[in-house]
Every structure is written in structure tokens, then in C-alpha cells.
Amino acid sequence: VAEHSEVFNALIAAARNGKHVTVFVELKARFDEENNLATAELMRKAGIDIIFSIPGLKVHAKVALILRKNDKGERLRSYAYVSTGNFNEKTAKIYADIALYTCNKQIVDDMCTLFKVLRKEVTEPRFKRLLIARFNLLPELKALIQREIDLVKEGKPGRIILKMNALQDTAMIDELYRASEAGVQIDLIVRGICCLVPGESFSRNIRVTRIVDSFLEHARVWYFGNGGDPLVFIGSPDWMRRNLYRRIEAVTPILDGRLRRELTDMLELQLSANRKACWVDNQLRNIFKRKPGNDDVRA
């Protein structure tokens, strides 16, 4: 959270108004350790139940769970929140992020399970909708890529669009190379580190776009064509070893068709951008897209 956080103040106000509030505080937060400790102590004094980091495991997920109950303690409608960005007002002003706030029962139930994991109440969780790193994220990702490969083998188009901050994990890069060789059309929007080499014989169907503009592109959005019934996901992890193997990360599917179309339109707009965007070539150089005579597209 920010040093003077409205989120933090709202949580304290909720606790003082008789709400049961639990906050997981990740202490291993670059440059924010001291502030996180001080904030956690203030929340504890306000009656908030504080859960600190799990030793040897960083939690990078950006999630929240709201459970509404009646006077008898019976659960009413509940809500889950999954975001690509932190609860930080300072960075929220300059980072471009996406969040989902939903009452979908399966996602809410999965979120309850995730918080049980953070409380160390569950060690082998099962998730129906959420993709959680260290549990079901990697197998599901590989299955999604394989689905696109299978579609191409059936003579149908395979399509993948991935937006992230960094692409570094060699195992997942190899999965994308395998999909490219099978004929899946792949577009990547990668702001930072990109260890995938596009434009070679094994990656001829992969294009990499980089956008650097006024706001920092921080969202992680994944699109899979799925034979004309697209699957879209948002979440916290980049495709780096530390995110996929050594942290708790949370990814949610976007189940509402209108929201899926909105995110798909955003991805297509960013792929068409040429004013503040560039290609990444097979030497990993930035090649500006903007050319004289072309209409400017700023995404």
C-alpha cells in the first residue's frame, strides 16, 4: 500500500465499525518493507487480524474477498477481487492495470480456498476457476496452448495474444515456440524483458510488440482463440521463473462476454498501435512501427 493509504484507512474504519477484517501482509516487498511493517502494526492495534508472509514463499497475488453475513451468521452474497496491480494509490496514478470484482460463486469459493492456503489451513487445494501459481497455473497454461495447437491440426485457426511485463521462463517460451511451429498465430505485448526470439524458423508465427508511453503498462492479459469461443484471463504473474514457480500468483478467467470483448478490443488496439509502439526483431532490437504516411494509433 501507499505510505498514506486510503485503503489502509478504510480497513481500519471497517474494523472499528464491527467488521471482521483479515489482511495478509507480504513483507518481502521491494522498497516497501518498512512501510508494510508500520502499516501492519497500526492495523493490528485497530483489531485487524494480520497474517504475515509465509517463510520462503512470496505472495504476489493481488486479491480480496468480501463475505457478507446476516445477524444469524448466515452468508449472504459474497465478492471476490482479482487484479493485475497493487493496492497502492501512488502507483495507481501512473500504472495501467485491470481488475475484476465479481460475485461468481465458483470464483468466490476459490478465493476462500486461496485464503485458507495463506492461513496454512489447506496444503493441497483444488481450484475450479482461479489459476494459482504453485498449484494449477502451469498445467492449465500448457493445456490452453495445447488446445490451440490441436485446433490447427484439425484445420482450424489457432490464436494466442499475451500481454505481460516480462517473458523469461524458458519452459513456457519453448511452449510458445512449439505452438508457432504448429501454425498457431501468436502476438505478444511485452513491456520489459523478453527472452523469446521472434522471426526465426521456429518462431515465424510469433510477433512481439513493445509499448512505452505516459503510463506504465502493468496489466497481464491472456487471450486464447479456443476455436471462436475466446478464453480471456487477467492476473498478477509475468512469465518469469520466480512468478511461475516460487510465488503465489492469482489469475482469473473473464466469464462475462461483454468484458471479454472489451479486453479483446483493448489488445487489438494495442497491437495496432504505432506511435509509441515498436516491434521486437530477431536480434531483440526495438524497431519503431511508425512510418511516414501511416495514420497514428496511440494505445
Predicted feature locations:
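Gly-rich Lys/Arg/Thr-decorated short loops/hinges at beta-loop-alpha junctions or inter-strand turns
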Residues: 121-130, 155-157
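PLD/PLD-like phosphodiesterase catalytic module centered on the HKD motif
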Residues: 13, 17-94, 101-108, 134-299
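Active-site core of PLP-dependent enzymes with the aminotransferase class I/II
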Residues: 2-9, 170-173
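Short, compositionally biased "basic patch" segments
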Residues: 106-125, 139-140
